[in-house]
């Protein structure tokens, strides 16, 4: 652990409903068990989330589905990255974003699979995922028919079937096109 690295990752990029969450994290001390959030159980992510928030400087940016629809995913990512970069300015010597695109934001280094290699990026991955999952559990209480507690807003068969039956909620990304719901050339 360097103490000079800020890791950034996001959750909810390809979902049909719910926010895009982008987190930046600079660890104050080493935390055992950090890994890519997708490789951890929900229980373990929650445990690590508590440790990370107590032992780091962090920022989480939550972007609504409406904003994604209005300005697009890339512009939303750019905005979130700029906010995180501004927050960590002067605290971090190196800012590493998981992926291969900077979305036009200067001062970022990108690294594919950084969430599996760099503790600070793993921590950011966990912060983003837990924040987003908690929002989806709240939405599941309001819209139980969509199965948000299980699918977290991603395009599962059951979720797509619910959209076909009930339509979109205000938390769905209306700009995202679902192939199976598009009219066929032969209809």
What are these regions (language model features)?
Residues 1-187:
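RNase H-like, Mg2+-dependent phosphodiesterase core
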């Amino acid at each position: 652990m360097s103490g000079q690295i800020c890791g950034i990752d996001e959750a909810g990029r390809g979902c049909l409903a719910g926010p895009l969450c982008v987190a930046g994290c600079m660890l104050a001390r080493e935390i055992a068990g950090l890994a890519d959030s997708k490789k951890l159980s929900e229980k373990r992510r929650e445990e690590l989330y508590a440790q990370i928030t107590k032992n780091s400087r962090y920022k989480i940016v939550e972007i609504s589905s409406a904003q994604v629809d209005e300005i697009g995913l890339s512009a939303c990512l750019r905005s979130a990255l700029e906010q995180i970069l501004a927050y960590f300015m002067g605290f971090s010597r190196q800012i590493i974003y998981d992926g291969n695109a900077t979305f036009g934001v200067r001062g970022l280094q990108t690294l594919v699979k950084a969430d599996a290699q760099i503790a600070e990026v793993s921590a950011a991955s966990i912060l983003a995922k837990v924040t987003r999952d908690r929002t989806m559990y709240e939405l599941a209480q309001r819209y139980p028919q969509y199965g948000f507690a299980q699918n977290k807003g991603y395009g599962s068969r059951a979720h797509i079937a619910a959209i076909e039956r009930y339509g979109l909620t205000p938390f769905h990304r209306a700009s995202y096109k679902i192939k199976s719901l598009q009219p066929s050339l032969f209809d």
